[in-house]
Amino acid sequence: MATSKVERLVNLVIALLSTRGYMTAEKIRSSVAGYSDSPTVEAFSRMFERDKNELRDLGIPLEVGKVSALDPSEGYRINRDAYALPPVELTPDEAAAVAVATQLWESQELITATQGALLKLRAAGVDIDPLDTPVVIASSSGVSSLRGSEDFLSILLSAIGSRQAVQFPYRPSRAEPYTMRNVEPWGVITENSCWYLVGHDCDRNATRTFRLSRIGSEVAPIGPAGAVTVPDGVDLRRIVSDAVAEVSTGATARVWVVDGRATALRHAGRPAGVRRLGGRDGQVIELDIGSIDRLARDIAGHGADAVVLEPDALRDDVLIRLRAHAGTGPS
């Protein structure tokens, strides 16, 4: 199969950045993947000339010089110092975008491809710099690592672009089991150095955020492309900020707690009367709702000793978590 133009140009840049000296056109033809496809020297020369012009048009500093004092042949290389970018000031959104691209490039699939290209150059006798002195691309220190999430991040981004629903295992915390979620994805956002998927949770029929580090690796697109509609004017960053905020949203939950148990919830709430439920004496408390996911997790942790009376959305969320712990589906 013929090598694509983009792949050939990338191979050429890797080769010319990695070589210590100048590479002759003959060495490039024999060792850089994509040029051996040329059937004749003339065809190679035309292709190589076009590629050199394209690199220069892209602003890549291609240098021409003698191979050595003993070999006056003309060769080529890319000066790393001239190739490197000057310091760049990025906005938080720009830094996040660069971090995504950088960490996708650092994924095992692309690392393997890059190392494979360098090994082929070595095998062809090209004198290149050691593997421990690579060209470095730095990401923003304010953006958390995606390590462990790179594989499925590309699937999520593809699904967002094609407006397709996804299915994946998710756990709200490491102490809880994974449950399968069906989501219409709207976008990926960073907040407080963490990565979140925002979308419509089909199982809960509500807008939800999902921290990428808590998504299992088995992410798969489901349903037809084009089926997902992102609401007009939706503010993904605001959704994430509200979901992870510790401040009160102004909403209140009413929760029944059995006497003598669920002490942490009792201390966090305000007494709102006594009530007997399921044959057990208890107390009704009112709790401010900051993050509904966090509150649902806290309440579910007390099992049958805490029961949500209202709102319905919080009660449903707690029931889903309890059923997941019990290993049963929705009833």
UniProtKB/Swiss-Prot annotation:
Record-linked Pfam families: WYL
Transmembrane segments: none
Record domain WYL: where: 145-225
Function comment: Does not seem to be involved in pupylation or substrate degradation.
Family listed: Belongs to the PafB family.
Subunit text: Interacts with PafC; with which it probably forms a heterocomplex.
Name of the protein in its database record: Protein PafB
Annotated organism of origin: Mycobacterium leprae (strain TN)
Designated gene of the protein: pafB
